Regions:
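Basic, alpha-helical nucleic-acid-binding regions used in initiation and control of genome expression
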Residues: 1-280
């Protein structure tokens, strides 16, 4: 027989389910695993519940916490929808909101809380307070560019627009991956490297849309290679999102410029992406 918890801590805006459960474990001075067992949940880790909450576990937690099942589902990483490939950190946050961290740390019951947006690879600003998100992984922090960098300042407005485009794509129409495909494609090497800046490491397609990106990347992230996922450091993510916004605004205009610049193997996927954007 599952016993409901006598005292419940209210969830924070944008808080992950694992964070909310973890704060209760700390409050009751038990381990996270023990709390899950008390709920009748057999999960490998707290984080696994964020990524794949089964109907059984959802019911068990809802009973223990005297909370509506749908409220729990909305606290998961995908909110019950399909997660966008490569855009969600599976374990540790990519970025944090310093303002929210300070606010959480001011109260023992909220200290250590983690927000959903800290794991999402299309975010540049906090959906709770609007503050700029900051890299928190050591390697990304080492290569962090100043927000006042001329290129970052020049594309900031378009980056915010790109963030909204990705948010819309992920939340409202997860089946349409055009914006995500475009985000990936903009980091592809260009087909004709002799057209690049002579000082660029690997000439990227994004430099066609954001002039000066190749030199910026060389200066701020030497040795950067296109990653297997889209969990990019902020200094790279901001220009990429700005590029997404510019292309989405005028897909037919950019089709003429981007398709000749990309390699043969990547051209069909990019062409399909641009065609879908033009029809949307």
């Amino acid at each position: 027989m599952i016993r409901p918890l006598p005292v419940l801590l209210p969830p924070l805006p944008d808080e992950l389910l694992s964070s909310w459960l973890g704060r209760h474990a700390t409050f009751y001075r038990v381990s996270g695993g023990r709390l899950l067992r008390h709920c009748g949940v057999d999960a490998g880790s707290m984080r696994s519940i964020d990524l794949a909450l089964s109907a059984h576990d959802q019911r068990q937690i809802a009973r223990t916490f005297r909370t509506a099942s749908q409220a729990l589902r909305r606290m998961t990483q995908s909110r019950g929808r399909r997660r966008p490939a490569g855009l969600i950190a599976t374990d540790r946050p990519m970025q944090v909101c310093r303002r929210c961290v300070i606010r959480h740390d001011a109260t023992p019951e909220t200290r250590g809380a983690r927000l959903r947006s800290w794991m999402e690879g299309w975010r540049v600003s906090c959906p709770v307070c609007g503050a700029r998100l900051d890299d928190c992984r050591p390697m990304n922090m080492l290569n962090r560019a100043s927000p006042a960098d001329p290129l970052l300042a020049r594309v900031a407005e378009h980056a915010a627009e790109g963030e909204m485009i990705l948010e819309e794509a992920v939340r409202r129409n997860p089946q349409d991956g055009s914006a995500i495909t475009l985000m990936r494609s903009l980091l592809l090497p260009r087909a004709h490297p002799w057209q690049a800046s002579p000082t660029a490491d690997i000439p990227r397609l994004l430099n066609v849309v954001i002039t000066g990106f190749d030199d910026f990347l060389r200066d701020t992230s030497p040795g950067f290679r296109r990653p297997g996922t889209l969990l990019l450091p902020m200094s790279v993510r901001i220009p990429v999102l700005a590029g997404v916004a510019r292309v989405v605004r005028r897909p037919s205009h950019w089709t003429e410029r981007l398709l000749p610049a990309v390699g043969d193997s990547a051209r069909p996927a990019l062409a399909g992406c641009l065609r879908a954007l033009g029809e949307s």
